[in-house]
Design a protein with these regions (language model features):
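Catalytic machinery of carbohydrate-active enzymes
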Residues: 2-430
């Protein structure tokens, strides 16, 4: 792994790359010590309880709760499991507990019967527990490592609680699979099905797009003057905002997205800027670094229309964000620019997707433990570069990304068009 040129591979290439983590600050050490104490007591009690009771047989689920807090991408990574639950337990009722901002990721999903929102107040948490107890749910899948999420299932009286074995945080679970922050999160979530004697879920994510959303997207493209004979690339320069946190360290520089768009436009490729909620300043900064014009700016759209627009793209260039997963969920090729995140953990798997990761000595540093214990989060939960250099993103140039994008477009079956400049870039990269 060099620090002067980026690496381009499928996500699976980087399985088990080690993390580069500095020592925890005092506050983080205190929080971790308290968590370790709670988990030690909990694990000791759990072992004693198991020793006193007979071995419990697996329950055939009739009512299932899936706990998945986080942003859009987190929810989409759970869709393979949800699909597998419906396939193997078609008569079971499936509830999913998600953050408010991620609800749209499951609306219209055939795999979910009821969507529950993560409460904001103590009163609402008590109401949620009462509802879960009243529903008499028999099985919970907890898709988080920290013990608090599995405690919720325990307090809700759910007898079968399945999740991840991470240190001692799984003491409230009745069944678990190993967890690693250096392996594909989607694959690990899908593996939870094996706890019920079923094969692991196929990792292909899914997102439901209605016909109405498709018509809206086509109308939008027609208004922009979209030419189906030319390649179309979607660029999303924003993201990095999840439920309750901001992650600017995970964003490639917006001006470099603009420079990339300029190179693509000069190469004869149509470019659409994808702008989600809160992305306006990043899109504006990207456009300032272009002398040409983009085909259009997809802003203020419902998520389904935003997704339908992505479907028309030959390829999407993104940061490690929800739109990365949204594109992959619709089998749209993705080129993901990754910095502090482990390059095997969140990016989508498959030959159609490419991950650009600089592999600088201080990366990857974005670990689930960091979120819990606050190593590089300030009081407002803002994830920042712990060295203050953002070297992992600064090391990736627009020209490098351009070559990867051009090569991917040329590799697409029945590719109708690509400018000579883009073809030359591929030759230079070969």
């Amino acid at each position: 792994m060099g620090d002067t040129s980026s690496r381009v591979e499928e996500a699976r290439y980087w399985d088990d790359v080690p993390f580069q983590l500095p020592p925890l600050p005092f506050r983080g050490r205190v929080r971790r010590a308290l968590a370790d104490l709670i988990c030690f007591v909990g694990m000791t009690a759990a072992k004693a309880a198991r020793a006193l009771r007979a071995v419990r047989k697996a329950i055939v689920p009739e009512k299932i709760l899936v706990v998945r807090r986080g942003g859009l991408g987190d929810v989409l990574m759970a869709t393979p499991l949800l699909r597998g639950l419906r396939e193997h337990f078609p008569s079971a009722r499936v509830y999913v507990l998600v953050s408010k901002q991620a609800v749209a990721g499951l609306q219209g999903s055939p795999w979910v019967d009821e969507i529950l929102e993560v409460p904001r107040s103590k009163k609402d948490w008590l109401s949620l527990l009462q509802k879960l107890r009243k529903e008499r749910i028999d099985t919970a899948f907890v898709l988080h490592r920290f013990f608090a999420a599995s405690l919720l299932a325990l307090l809700a009286g759910i007898p079968q609680r399945l999740g991840f074995a991470w240190k001692n945080h799984g003491f409230a679970l009745t069944g678990s699979v190993p967890f690693s922050p250096a392996r594909s999160q989607t694959l690990q979530i899908g593996q939870l099905l094996t706890l019920l004697g079923k094969p692991a879920a196929d990792p292909q994510m899914e997102f439901t797009v209605s016909e109405d959303a498709g018509r809206c997207a086509r109308k939008l493209l027609e208004g922009w003057g979209y030419d189906p004979a030319k390649s179309l690339v979607g660029i999303h320069p924003g993201g990095g905002e999840t439920a309750g946190s901001s992650e600017p360290a995970k964003r490639w520089l917006p001006e470099r997205f603009g420079q990339l768009a300029e190179l693509l436009e000069q190469g004869g490729v149509q470019v659409v800027m994808l702008q989600g909620p809160g992305d306006e300043p990043f899109v504006e900064e990207a456009l300032k670094n272009m002398t040409g014009r983009v085909l259009g700016i997809a802003a203020g759209l419902p998520l389904a229309v935003f997704a339908a627009l992505m479907r028309v793209c030959d390829l999407v260039v993104v940061n490690d964000t929800g739109p990365m997963h949204l594109a992959a969920a619709q089998k749209v090729p993705v080129v993901a620019v990754i910095g502090p995140t482990h390059p095997a953990y969140t990016p989508p798997r498959g030959e159609m997707h490419k991950v650009i990761w600089a592999g600088v000595p201080c990366s990857p540093c974005y670990n689930p433990e960091e979120y819990i214990f606050g190593t590089r989060w300030n009081g407002k939960k803002v994830f920042q570069c712990w060295r203050g250099t953002h070297e992992c993103m600064m090391a990736i140039t627009p020209e490098e990304v351009y070559k990867v994008v051009a090569a991917q477009i040329l590799a697409l079956e029945n590719n109708p068009y690509l400018g000579e400049q883009a073809k030359s870039a591929v030759e230079l990269n070969s």
